[in-house]
C-alpha cells in the first residue's frame, strides 16, 4: 500500500480552478486503480502556512526527534518524507507558481528529513518515490525560458532524491479564440491515462 500526498496550491475554488479539474480527475482515476492506497489531501490555502520568520529557524535547524514531529513547521517535512507519491496541482502564476507553494517547500526542505549534508555535498533522502505536477498555463510555455515553475519543482524534487517526475500541462488557456473546455478535457484525458500507471 502506498501513501499519496495530494498537494493543492490554488486560491480558486474547486469548480473554478482548471488545474483542479484535471488534478481531481487524476486522483479519482488513481483511486479506482489503487483502492488500497491512502491519499492525503493538503490544500495549502487551508493550512496554517506562512513565510518563514526568524523564530522558525530554530525549529527547522533544531533536533529531529519524536517530539519534533509535532512541531508546527516540521510536521509538514515529516509528512512529506513519509509519502511514497506526490501529486502537485498548481497553476502557473507570473511564470512560476503561487507563492504559498514556495512557502510550503521552505517548510519541507529540512536537512535530516528530506535531504542531508555530506562531505561530498547534499544528498536527497527521498529515493524511489515519484511525483506528478499538474499545471494550467495561460500561454504556450513548453521549452520556454519563461517557464520557471515546473523547472523549479523538478529541481527541488530531484534535490530531495525524487527522480521519477511527470508533468501534465494544460497550455494556452488564455489565448483568444482557444476552446478552453476542449483544452481542459484534453488535460483530463492525459491525467486519466497517466493515473492508471502512476
Curated annotation (Swiss-Prot):
Cite the GO molecular-function annotations of the record: electron transfer activity; FMN binding; oxidoreductase activity, acting on NAD(P)H as acceptor; oxidoreductase activity, acting on NAD(P)H, quinone or similar compound as acceptor
Q: What class of enzyme is it?
A: oxidoreductase
What does the note under cofactor report?
Binds 1 FMN per subunit.
Q: Which domain of life is it from?
A: Bacteria
Arranged from A to Z, the UniProt key words for this protein are: Flavoprotein, FMN, NAD, Oxidoreductase
Cofactor(s) needed for function: FMN
Enzyme Commission number(s) from the entry: 1.6.5.-, 1.7.1.17
Task: Tell me one Pfam family matched here.
Answer: Flavodoxin_2
Concerning InterPro entries, the annotation shows: Flavodoxin_fold, Flavoprotein-like_sf, FMN-dep_NADH:Q_OxRdtase_AzoR1, NADH:quinone_OxRdtase_FMN_depd
Record-listed FMN binding positions: 92-95, 136-139
Q: How does it assemble?
A: Homodimer.
Q: Which family does it belong to?
A: Belongs to the azoreductase type 1 family.
> Could you tell me what this protein does?
Quinone reductase that provides resistance to thiol-specific stress caused by electrophilic quinones.
The record's HAMAP family line, in alphabetical order, gives: Azoreductase_type1 (MF_01216)
Q: What is this protein called?
A: FMN-dependent NADH:quinone oxidoreductase
